[in-house]
Amino acid sequence: MIDTLKDRLKAKPKKWLVTGVAGFIGSNLLEELLQWDQAVVGLDNLSTGYRYNLEDVKKEVGHKKWSRFTFYEGDIRNLTDCRKACEEVDYVLHQAALASVPRSIEDPIATSQSNIDGFLNMIVAARDAGMKRFVYAGSSATYGDHPELPKREDKMGHPLSPYAVTKYVNELYADVFARTYGLECIGLRYFNVFGRRQDPNGAYAAVIPRWIDSFLNLVEPTIHGDGETSRDFCYITNAVEANLLAATTDNAEALNKVYNIAYGSRTTLNQLYQIIREEVSQYKPEAKTIEPIYGLFRQGDIRHSLADISRAKELLGYDPKFDVKQGMAESIKWYINKT
């Protein structure tokens, strides 16, 4: 299905807006769209995104494809910036956010300003620009304390962090804008996306790039808790394809819904540790002997996560190709080549 879509878009290119374009997921969306000969506008305030991600994309796609990209350094908290970025755009892929549970606990106001106020600015600008469709990044954090596994889109618990609250509010706004203004909206609840260009540095870095970086530098990684906390890890290529399918689907039944975007399998942190150590050891044999440090459980984290992806498969044609081991092999190869 994704190959058919690629051929269709190459034959008739569209203009896309990617917010958070200099970030992890945003830069990967940019790269794929440019490889598909699309015109792309990018918006980013460079607070958690980086120019070197854009430079990396430029290197990957070449000068000719790069010429189809326009970058605006702007802020989703500024409605004027959002309106400027939305001019003559067909589709929005809204990725910009402060995407960290610990950060939201430390600074709920900044998280709300970016994730709620910024989202509202963006969806208003998209509505006023006559946008065809608004696809936005949701989060599995919205499931909160609901105990059932696998997670199904219609069964929610109480949020466990300010970040989770903001992502749920996004879904409520999208639903209201769809029903009130007729704007086609699709939300993608990401489950622990990982892969190339994910930042290993800083206090709020995600576990996978942080551990890869630790192994490459022969430093003992820290596991929060007993290591039996589990997640449904989703390789970046799967998430990118989900965005493109959501933006272009002709299935009317698929519109104005939220979807779990994951692989559909569960991996504990202890298992993840072994997978990363095994992969890194192929490049750096000394990593084989490194043992983890077990620390405290992290406040606001859910204990287990596993996605039911049947809705995305049925309505969007989502078909994730990379499991956690395949994705990890690709990720580590990328990090090795960049160091």
For each feature predicted by the language model, list its residue ranges.
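C-terminal substrate-binding subdomain of Rossmann-fold SDR/epimerase-dehydratase oxidoreductases
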Residues: 9-10, 16, 70, 215-339
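Short-chain dehydrogenase/reductase
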Residues: 112, 160-171, 202-209, 233, ...
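Glutamine-centric residue-chemistry signal
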Residues: 94-95, 198, 229
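Short glycine/proline- and charge-enriched loop/turn segments
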Residues: 149-158, 206, 293-296, 309
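N-terminal Rossmann-like NAD(P)+-binding domain of SDR-like oxidoreductases, especially those catalyzing
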Residues: 1-193, 243, 247, 318, ...
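Residues in well-ordered alpha-helical elements
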Residues: 80-83, 90, 102, 109, ...
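Hydrophobic alpha-helix immediately C-terminal to the catalytic Tyr-X-X-X-Lys motif of short-chain
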Residues: 169, 173, 177, 207, ...
